[in-house]
Regions:
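N-terminal chloroplast transit peptides
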Residues: 1-6, 14, 26-27, 48-50
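Compositionally biased low-complexity segments enriched in histidine and/or tyrosine
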Residues: 28-34
Length: 331
């Protein structure tokens, strides 16, 4: 899978100027920002949407919540242009913050549900977007959000999900979302670049692991471009990247099976994968011992022509599914 990164410094003088003039002063004083033109106008070209500081949260950003606000107008435009949102989409935005992306997403979609865990930021965002059609601010933990219920309440079958994800909670968020994969049309996330490499890694490579299998079971994931620390306020210690996910059918989907049956199998398989990668470089049988008898795991992998000492990181998504299927009767 091809991986494309944006060179830094930017090759375009205009891009560099846009980045430093819109962000430089914000790096000295962390501030929340909003796309002024996108919020206040019916429709403006993306190039005309500029980020302008509106206020600081009264207590500043909260490091424990992994808050790094996207403050670069140049990269915000690139992200919106790269995210495959359709005009009739219901978009769920994870970690809306101060709305740096919310207005721009709403210009492309039918409706945006901006989910923000921080009650202070959610309240401020409601005030800023008061009266703006097509945007709903929801103060909630994404890990407690039921996508099926959300889609049902908005009269749609699927949703598109976007987020600038807190680096420390990327895996739990993906695990939670993919339990409801049939309700997701597509996804795009800004994540730590190291995490992006893990998501797109192939079996047997150093970055390959639980995140790789999690993403690749239900999507074709690719890195769109990288984002430097200076595009955020406060700047993180690492580079970030935009990763897009084109959803595919999962291995659990069987002809004639009901959606409920598929969902149950999907959840069991995701839990199986999580257990299989519980400790890196440990044998699959040992990692799964809390869920399945170790002898049953070894017998299952040997029946598939694999070594009884195999590790999860050596197996492809298809291999892991075969092992899971072989173990179905051993619990």
């Amino acid at each position: 899978m091809a991986t494309a990164f944006v060179p830094w410094p930017p090759p375009s003088p205009a891009l560099a100027e846009d980045h430093f003039t819109s962000v430089g002063h914000l790096l000295r004083v962390p501030a929340c920002v909003r796309p002024v033109d996108c919020v206040t106008s019916k429709m403006r070209p993306l190039a005309a949407c500029a980020l302008t500081p509106i206020h600081r949260p009264k207590t500043g950003h909260r490091p424990k919540l992994g808050q790094h606000f996207l403050t670069s107008a140049a990269f915000r435009r690139r992200i919106v242009e790269a995210v495959p949102i359709r005009r009739n989409d219901l978009v769920v935005e994870i970690g809306a913050g101060c709305g740096a992306m919310t207005g721009s997403l709403a210009e492309r979609a039918a409706r945006v549900v901006a989910v923000e865990l921080d009650s202070r930021l959610a309240d401020e965002l409601r005030k800023e977007l008061a009266g703006r059609e097509g945007i709903e601010v929801l103060q909630a933990d994404i890990l407690g959000l039921d996508l099926a219920d959300l889609c049902r309440s908005h009269g749609v079958e699927q949703t598109f999900i976007f987020g600038n994800l807190p680096y420390y909670i990327t895996s739990p968020i993906l695990h939670h979302l993919l339990k409801s994969a049939r309700h997701i049309r597509g996804m795009a996330f800004v994540v730590q670049r190291e995490v992006a490499l893990r998501i797109t890694a192939g079996a047997g490579s150093r970055p390959y692991g639980y995140l790789s299998v999690l993403a690749q079971c239900y999507s074709k994931a690719r890195i769109a471009f990288s984002i430097p620390p200076g595009a955020f306020s406060p700047p993180p210690a690492v580079h970030s990247a935009l990763v897009t996910f084109e959803m595919t059918g999962g291995p659990e989907e069987e002809e004639g099976a009901s959606a409920v049956q598929d969902d149950l199998r999907r959840r069991k398989f995701l839990d199986f994968v999580k257990a299989g990668f519980a400790q890196k470089r440990k044998k699959l049988a040992n990692n799964l011992s809390a869920v399945y008898p170790a002898d049953a795991v070894r017998d299952a992998v040997r029946s598939l022509g694999l070594s009884g000492n195999v590790r999860a990181e050596e197996l492809t998504v298809a291999d892991l599914w075969r092992v899971f299927e072989a173990l179905n009767g051993s619990r």
